[in-house]
Design a protein with these regions (language model features):
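Glycine-rich phosphate/dinucleotide-binding loop and adjoining beta-alpha-beta core of small-molecule
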Residues: 58-132
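Short acidic loop-to-helix transition motifs that present clustered carboxylates
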Residues: 52-57
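Glycine-rich phosphate/adenosyl-contacting loop at the front of the ribokinase-like
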Residues: 1-50
Length: 132
């Protein structure tokens, strides 16, 4: 377990690395926070791109260093987009974050999380921590 000073040092190092490399961390995010997410990425020196379509999600993973998947405002197309982007990131060994906003509200959110969990168990792989 790391203490607060170590956490602060890790955060400073991460921001310095981001500013030095300007990585693309794409997002499939909800309409409520899309501006906030993009501005947060830009503020620390990253590059931001937001998409909705499955093929664009896969392309964003291929061209970027990581992807953020937010389930806050789901559109029917996300039933394809989120699993395909997560699988593309997983298969490429790239970090990805699933933000399960509202999990348990409606069947689509639960279905998406269950699908990724089953896929991950079948793959018998673990995700790399961000920055490794």
């Amino acid at each position: 377990m790391i203490d607060s000073e170590q956490l602060k040092q890790h955060m400073v190092k991460a921001v310095e690395e981001i500013r030095a490399t300007n990585p693309m961390a794409g997002s499939i995010t909800n309409t409520v926070t899309i501006d906030f997410v993009a501005n947060a990425q830009l503020a620390v020196g990253g590059s931001a791109a937001m998409v909705y379509l499955p093929d664009e999600g896969e392309a964003l993973v291929a061209g970027g260093g990581a992807i953020y998947l937010n389930m806050g405002t789901l559109f029917p197309i996300y039933e394809q987009t989120i699993p395909r982007a997560a699988k593309a990131a997983h298969d490429a060994g790239k970090p990805w974050v699933l933000d399960p906003v509202g999990l348990g509200i409606g069947s689509l959110r639960t279905q998406l999380v269950n699908h990724r969990t089953r896929q991950r168990l079948r793959d018998h792989r673990t995700l790399r921590p961000v920055g490794s």
